Amino acid sequence: MSDYKFTLNLPETEFPMRGNLANREPEMLERWTKDGLYQQIRDSRIGRTPFILHDGPPYANGSIHIGHSVNKILKDIIIKSKTMSGFDAPYVPGWDCHGLPIELKVEQKVGKPGQKISAAEFREECRKYAAEQVNGQREDFIRLGVLGDWQNPYLTMDFSTEANIVRSLSKVIESGHLHKGVKPVHWCTDCGSALAEAEVEYEDKTSPAIDVAFVAADSKAVAAKFGVSDYSHPVSMVIWTTTPWTLPANRALSLSPELDYSLVEFEKDGVTQALILAEVLVESCLTRYNVESHTVLGSAKGAAFELVRFNHPFLDFDVPAILGDHVTTDAGTGIVHTAPGHGQDDFVVGQKYGLEVANPVGDNGVYKPDTEYFAGQHVFKANDNVVALLREKSALLNHVAYRHSYPHCWRHKTPIIFRATPQWFISMDNHGLRTQALKEIEQTQWIPDWGQSRIEKMVENRPDWCISRQRTWGVPITLFVNRETEELHPDSVSLMERVASRIEQQGIQAWWDLDAAELLGDEAEQYRKVTDTLDVWFDSGSTFSSVVAARPEFHGHGVDLYLEGSDQHRGWFMSSLMISTAMNGKAPYKQVLTHGFTVDGKGRKMSKSIGNVIAPQTVTNKLGADILRLWVAATDYSGEMTVSDEILNRSADAYRRIRNTARFLLANLNGFEPAKDLVAVEDMVALDRWVVRRAAALQQEIIEAYEQYNFHIVTQKLMQFCSVELGSFYLDIIKDRQYTAKQEGHARRSCQSALYLISEAMVRWIAPILSFTADEVWQLLPGERDAYVFTQEWYQGLKSVTLATDLSDDYWQQLLTVRNEVNKVIEQARRDKRIGGSLEAEVTLFADAALTEQLTHIGDELRFVLLTSEAKVLPLADATSEAVETELASLKLLVASSTAEKCERCWHHREEVGTIEAHPTLCTRCVTNIEGDGEVRLFA
C-alpha cells in the first residue's frame, strides 16, 4: 500500500469552525419556536420540585438597552441551570404597562385627556401603545436566546392582573394599613402628580441660599433667657434655607433641645442687632454676614425657647420656636425654618406640635390665588421676589447662589417640590409594618450580602408610602368615601371584590364607567368615588399575588428568587416587600439577587451624548447573542459591569476557544457509536480515565457555582479546562492515538469514549450560557438522544474511577508540568533551526531519583505524552554541560534532532523504519495498527 493516508482516522464534523452566530441563531430560534421548545421543557419537569424566579417587569416603553439584556440573560442562565438540576423552573416574563411615561407618549400623539380626547379613549390609546412596546421588546428578548412563555407573558394591564391588583389593595386595607392624610410628598409640577421615592433622581442644582431673621414677639423676654436684663434692641432668630419659596408656608422655627445657642450683638450700618445662632456656628454665620466684631451676650440651651413666639418676616402672624431631633449643625444657623406642608421632617415635628399644614401651592407649582404677595407666581420663579421682599422688610442677612444635590423628576429631569396634598398612604407604623418588614429582611438571603443592610436602612428611614396618583392611565383606587366625614365605606373590602370582578371582565375602564348606585343603592348620594390611581410601584409590587399566586404554572409555590438591578432595593424589592408584608405578614421572596449597572470601558454610564452606548441589537447582529451571553456570564455582576467593543471582542476570542474545543471533540467522535463502542471508565487507558475523573470533579464545581449564581466562576473553570487540561495537555497527547491507532481498537475507542463523556457533560455545562452553541453541539453528538439539551439534567455518565494500579491525579499534574518544560526547550530548538516539529526531536530528561521513578513508570509511552519521537530518562548527576536547566530543580533537558527515518504514516522518527519489507516506510506500531490487532496503550 503506497498511500497510507486512507488508513488514518482523520477528524470529520459538520460543526463549522466559524460560528456565524448572527446568521445561524435566528434559524435556531425559528426551530425552537416551531418545535414548542419551552413547552417541551415544561412537560419534561411535570411533578418536579418547583423553582420560581419571578420576573420584575420592565417598563413597556422604548427599545431594550444593554441593562435589560444583562437582566434577562442572568435570569435565563438561572432558569436553565435550575432546569438542568431537575427543578420545574417556569419563566413567565412580564411588563409594567401603566403610568406616566406611557401617558406622556400618548399625549404627544392625541393630546391630553379631557381636551381633544375623552379619558376613556385616552386609556384605550395608552393600552394600544403599551401593547406595541411589549411586542417590540419581546422580539429583542427572544433574540437573546431567553426561553420563556413569551406567548403568554403577564402584563400589569391584563384585565385579570388589574383586577388582582385591586384585590391586593383590598387585603392591605383589610389589614388596616391604609390611611388618608395631608402630607408632603415628592411632587412634580410638570407631571401634576405625586412621585414615588423610586421616581426621584438627585442632580446638582443652583438655588438661592438665604439667611433670614425672625424678630422675637417679645425681645426683652427672649434676651432674659440668656441672662440679659432689660434688653432694649430687637432680638432675632436666624434661619438658613435654599428654598425661599417655602417661606409663605413657614409655621415654626425648630431648634435642637440640647444644643447651645448664643445671643450675639453687633452693629451694622449704624443699627444694633442681636441674633440667636447655634454656638458652634457663630463664627461661620457672622463671616457670611460680613460682621467684623461682635459680642456674645449669653448662652442658653435650645430647650429654653420651646413655644416662644417670633414674628414671620413678611406675613402678619407670629410662629413658635419648637424642638426637633432633625436639627443639625452641619450647615446653616442651627435653627431650621419649618414649613410642615413642604418637608417630611417639618411635617413630623409639626404633627407633634399641632401646627397647620399650610400648602399655598397648586398642582402646577403656582401659588394659589389667596397667597399674599405671590399669588399666580410659579414657586421657582418666585424665589427672587421672596428675596426682594425680605430685603425690603430688612429681614435678609445674606443671599448667595448655592450649588447642591436636589431631587428631580425621573421623567422630566426637572426639579420637584415637597408639597402637602390629600393622598392615600400605606402606614409604616400604625400596624407595625416597618417592624415586621425589618424582620422579614433578616429571613431573606441577599446576594450580594450588602443588599441586606442597604434595604434595612431604607426601610428604617422611609416615610409612609404615598400610593395615590392623580393620573388617567393606571389602576384605580376603587374606594367610596363619605362626602361629609371623608371616611371609607364600611363595606369597602366586599365592594372592592365586586369592582374587581367587573375589572376582570372589562378592564379598569369598568371603574370609571361605574355608577355608584349600582353597588351602593340608596347610599350612593352619601358617597363619592375616589378618582386617584395607584402608584405603578403598587402594580409591579403586588405581582407576587396578582400574577404568581394566580397562574397555575407556579403551583402556588411562592417565589424563590427576585433578580434585578441594584436600583431596585428602593424600587421593586421595596414595594413588593411592603405589600406582601402588609397582606401576608411575610416577604414575597426567599432570595434577592442584584446586579450592577453597565458602564463603558472607562467606567462611565452609557450616554448617547458621550457616544458610548452599546446596543444589544447591534451586538447580536454583529457578533451573535452567545457572545453577549458569554460576556454577561463572565462578568462579576456584584459590581459595575464594564462593556465596550474591545471587551466584547475579548469575549468573542474566549468563545472561539470553547467552540474550537467543541469542534475537536465532535470531529474525533466521527464514526463512534456509544451503544456499541463505549469503553467502561474502569477499562480505559489511564490518561483517559484521568481526564474523565477531572471532568467529573469539574462538573461538581460547575454545578456548585451555578447553584451559588457565580456564573463568572463557571466560565473561568470552563475556560481553564478547555485551555489547560484539554487544549494544552490531553487533546494534544491523544491526537496521535486518535488518528493512527486501529480504528476499532481499544486504544482509540478508549479515548473516543472519554471524549464522548466529556462532550455529553460539557454540552450541558455550556447550555445555560451559550445556549445556541450548546444546541448546535447537541444536534451533532452521536447516539440516541432527546431533541434538545434544554430538557436534560446534568450528565450522570462521568464516573470518577480510580483503580488500585492507577497513577494519581498529582502524577498527571507533575507530568503536565514536565511536559510544559519540555515544550519550552523544544520551542527554543525550533527557533534555533535545530529541529522542525517536535516529532523530529529526541529528548533526554535528566531527573533526580523521585522524578525518574515517575517518568519511567509509563515506559516508552512517555514519548507520546511529550510528543517526541524518543524520550530517555537518565540520572540528574549525568547531565551534560549542554543540558538546559528548567524551573524544576529536579530536571534538566537535552534536545537533539533524531537521526532515525520518519514513518510516513505517523511521522514519528523510529529506527525500525525501513526494516519491514511489506511496509518499508512505516514503523512497527503503524504496521500493527494497519494489519494486526492494533497497538496496546496502558497509560497514554
Curated annotation (Swiss-Prot):
ATP binds at K608. The keyword Transmembrane helix does not apply. Its EC number is 6.1.1.5. Zn(2+) binds at C903, C906, C923, C926. Signal peptide: none annotated. A motif ('KMSKS' region) lies at residues 605-609. Its main location: cytoplasm. Disulfide bonds: none annotated. It is an enzyme of class 6 (ligase). Belongs to the class-I aminoacyl-tRNA synthetase family. IleS type 1 subfamily. Catalyzes the attachment of isoleucine to tRNA(Ile). As IleRS can inadvertently accommodate and process structurally similar amino acids such as valine, to avoid such errors it has two additional distinct tRNA(Ile)-dependent editing activities. One activity is designated as 'pretransfer' editing and involves the hydrolysis of activated Val-AMP. The other activity is designated 'posttransfer' editing and involves deacylation of mischarged Val-tRNA(Ile). Monomer. This is Isoleucine--tRNA ligase. The gene is ileS.
